[in-house]
């Protein structure tokens, strides 16, 4: 999605702030320095070196929650989900109040298809950091797949307060309302979006608003002369949000056709790519 959440600054800078905060609690300086160096190395693309430095920090202090958290962040960025999960679990074992570990474990749980656990982690993150609630669009998506549609609706309404021109947020709000109250109600309560510059988002918005068509979405996605990566991304989003629309409208055939194209033929290496993959897996489970 276009929507972003923590960290909002470069990872190495964010990590430096994190380790300084822990240093104030009396953590060993040597471990802090190792983790800061690891963050700088990772930001420079020296990933193996960053992992080695994090390993050294863990060896120096095996029960240091932040060391596992930092290494888990590295593994998550490297798309090594199981290793990231293991480190976030250990971080929370040693410090159950480490809010960001719940947030990142929630994202990894979702990627693994552990929907209920993902929603629970995001809930716990908000318990510990309630001020972050408007930013947490990932929680809204987890709530949708967990069947907690009213909670999801409220989450996307919160996000609208800080991100008013994101069609995806409006679409997920639509989906939550449609599941709980029907499509007619969801159109009446569709969140207002005036200008999402990403192609073909405004055509997707028109479809959900009841004044557009699937043909217009696909035509917009392939218009002009986008680069191959941009064309793939446009086509992914077109198929994915068409599939979600047909799914909630009860058109199983068209839903499967578009979702499978998004997840299998035009896949993208991003969180939304993972959402499409999870949705495709759920559809395949339903057919067995």
What would you call each of these model-derived segments?
Residues 56-57, 90-91, 124-125, 158-159, ...:
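Canonical positions in the second alpha-helix
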């Amino acid at each position: 999605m276009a929507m972003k959440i923590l960290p909002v600054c470069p990872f190495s800078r964010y990590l430096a702030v994190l380790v300084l905060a822990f240093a104030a609690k009396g953590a060993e300086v040597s471990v802090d320095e190792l983790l800061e160096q690891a963050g700088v190395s990772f930001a420079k693309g020296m990933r193996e070196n960053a992992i080695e430095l994090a390993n050294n920090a863990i060896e120096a202090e095996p029960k240091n929650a932040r060391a596992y958290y930092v290494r888990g962040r590295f593994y998550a960025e490297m798309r090594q989900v199981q290793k990231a999960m293991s480190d976030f679990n250990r971080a929370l074992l040693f410090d159950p109040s480490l809010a960001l570990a719940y947030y990142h474990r929630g994202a990894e749980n979702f990627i693994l298809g552990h929907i209920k656990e993902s929603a629970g982690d995001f809930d716990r993150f908000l318990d510990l950091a309630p001020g972050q609630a408007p930013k947490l669009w990932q929680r809204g998506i987890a709530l949708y797949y967990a069947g907690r549609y009213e909670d999801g609706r409220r989450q996307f309404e919160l996000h609208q307060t800080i991100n008013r021109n994101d069609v995806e947020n409006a679409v997920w709000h639509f989906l939550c309302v449609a599941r709980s109250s029907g499509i007619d109600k969801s159109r009446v309560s569709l969140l207002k979006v005036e200008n999402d510059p990403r192609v073909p988002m405004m055509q997707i918005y028109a479809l959900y608003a009841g004044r557009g068509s699937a043909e217009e979405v696909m035509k917009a996605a392939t218009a002009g002369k986008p680069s191959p990566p941009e064309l793939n991304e446009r086509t992914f989003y077109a198929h994915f949000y068409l599939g979600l629309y047909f799914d909630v409208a009860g058109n199983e055939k068209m839903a499967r056709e578009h979702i499978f194209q998004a997840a299998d033929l035009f896949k993208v290496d991003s969180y939304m790519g993972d959402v499409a993959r999870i949705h495709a897996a759920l559809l395949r489970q339903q057919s067995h």
